[in-house]
UniProtKB/Swiss-Prot annotation:
Role summary: This is one of the proteins that bind and probably mediate the attachment of the 5S RNA into the large ribosomal subunit, where it forms part of the central protuberance.
GO cellular component, one term: cytosolic large ribosomal subunit
One BP term from GO: translation
Description of how the protein assembles with itself and partners: Part of the 50S ribosomal subunit; part of the 5S rRNA/L5/L18/L25 subcomplex. Contacts the 5S and 23S rRNAs.
CDD domains: Ribosomal_L18_L5e
Keyword Nucleotidyltransferase: no
Taxonomic superkingdom: Bacteria
InterPro entries assigned to the protein according to its UniProt record, in alphabetical order: Ribosomal_uL18_bac-type, Ribosomal_uL18_bac/euk
Gene Ontology molecular-function annotations: 5S rRNA binding; structural constituent of ribosome
Organism the protein comes from: Rhizobium meliloti (strain 1021) (Ensifer meliloti)
The protein, known as: Large ribosomal subunit protein uL18
Keyword line: Ribonucleoprotein, Ribosomal protein, RNA-binding, rRNA-binding
Family label: Belongs to the universal ribosomal protein uL18 family.
PANTHER family to which the protein is assigned, alphabetical: 39S RIBOSOMAL PROTEIN L18, MITOCHONDRIAL, LARGE RIBOSOMAL SUBUNIT PROTEIN UL18M
Length: 120
């Protein structure tokens, strides 16, 4: 029987494999969530560089948020990331949710990024 960690690793590798198949040179929007915060960054895998990033630990957001672990915080991170991506000239990305299920905070961040102008 596979452990919980094995299942997460297998799911993450499956998602990354699918992303590589459809990326076509587009940067990826990678999302990570912990129990207290949420982090997102846009990564150019060809160059191996981070183009834009945002998290609930940013000084721009930290003072305005009650906590970094709710959907309101994820929405704020998504909007901030979309704003920073547009300044960097990025419109189209591939969404990399990793091993996280597309629900709750991950979904809130993705929808806010779409509203902010990112296409995925």
């Amino acid at each position: 029987m596979a452990s919980r960690k094995d299942t997460l690793v297998r799911r993450a590798s499956r998602v990354r494999r699918q992303i590589k198949a459809v990326a076509n040179g587009r940067p990826r929007l990678s999302v990570h969530r912990s129990s207290k915060n949420i982090y997102a960054q846009i990564i150019d895998d060809v160059a191996g560089k981070t183009i834009a990033s945002a998290s609930t630990l940013d000084t721009d957001l930290r003072s305005s948020l009650k906590t970094g672990a709710d959907t309101e915080a994820a929405t704020a991170v998504g909007k901030l990331l979309a704003e920073r991506a547009s300044k960097a000239g990025i419109k189209d990305v591939v969404f990399d949710r990793g091993a996280f299920i597309y629900h709750g905070r991950i979904k809130a961040l993705a929808e806010a990024a779409r509203e902010g102008g990112l296409n995925f």
